[in-house]
Amino acid sequence: PYRWLEDFTGEEVGAWVELQNDLSQKYLTKNQYRKKIKENLESIWVSNSKSIPQIRGGHIFYFFNEGSWQQSKFMTLACEGCNPEMLIDPNTFSEDGTVSLSSVSISPNGKFIAYSVSDGGSDWKTWKILKVETKETLDDQLKWTKFSSASWEPDNSGFYYLKYPEPKKEALSEINKNPQLYFHRVGSSQKMDTLIYERPDKPNWSWSIHISEDSLYQILSIGEGTDDRNRLYIKFKGEDTFLPIVDNLVATYRFL
């Protein structure tokens, strides 16, 4: 009976959402403690916060919020005691604040930042690359990614990411299957990306990749659906095939 609600952009769904909002606001505005709760929350929010720092290439990277920003800014320090510099301000992504910074991945030498952007809370992400020295966002744009990290090659040439086939119908409601693992080289078009791994025979599998510091191993962590357990596959440098280390969903495994 609720199938019609899957049409996110439909007028009927929009009208229903508006009615639901009106109903909830009528109830919430009657709460005699509403103003006091709001004031108390705002007093808590207005405080500086910093994320755990990461060090790459001698630079320190971290998220910072002075308390009133809707989204934290991504900052860098060239050295301890140096003045902080802002690299990414997601509050400028859109006027209504619906475009957010989802995740960041710093290249090993600290010269590039791969970061993903989400629009309207969607699981779909677009990956972009920032050059730290100039604070310039490059032309690289990687679309149709979802539930993906960016795993850098130790030589800083590029990173691996998970991509789904472009939806044929409605991007927000279509079921996504058959993800593919690609390698993107910094400064190139997504059309030039190299396909690293896919399993059309296992459409519900998804994976993340870890590259050893010496570049001798590529380790795939393979999940299935929402199961926390995973498989582990490995590929040695110079080889073409990933070999299973753990090929059954028995436990959760991590490569150290």
Regions found by a protein language model. Name each.
Residues 1-256:
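Beta-propeller folds
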